[in-house]
């Protein structure tokens, strides 16, 4: 099997409108398609970043809360590259999004920081 790339990442949110606004209006994802699935009472929102299909945002009635801690087994976080970490952090702060202090990766020497989506999913900004 030869894997070519990651096709998408699926995220289940607890408040669809809040998460949609966060990813679209605060982080700048573009809406590819929004579908209401009546049989499930839920939405599926396909989002792209710079023209590449990246995230499926799902809403389900009463989803259970996220149970994992950042260091638990399984998916830990999603990381996005940025040109200027200082500028990206400033933009997040201007939009009311708090970030952790900027740190330096001891293995690569690159700077990074974390912030959280409305459901406390850890998101990382990693400077190129």
Curated annotation (Swiss-Prot):
SUPFAM superfamilies: Glyoxalase/Bleomycin resistance protein/Dihydroxybiphenyl dioxygenase (SSF54593). GO terms for molecular function: metal ion binding. The keyword Metal-binding applies. Keywords: Metal-binding. PROSITE patterns: VOC. InterPro entries: Fosfomycin_Res_Enzymes (IPR051332), Glyas_Bleomycin-R_OHBP_Dase (IPR029068), Glyas_Fos-R_dOase_dom (IPR004360), VOC (IPR037523), YwkD-like_dom (IPR037478). Residues 5-128 form the VOC domain. A divalent metal cation binds at residues 8, 56, 77, 124. Pfam families: Glyoxalase. This is Uncharacterized protein YwkD. It comes from Bacillus subtilis (strain 168).
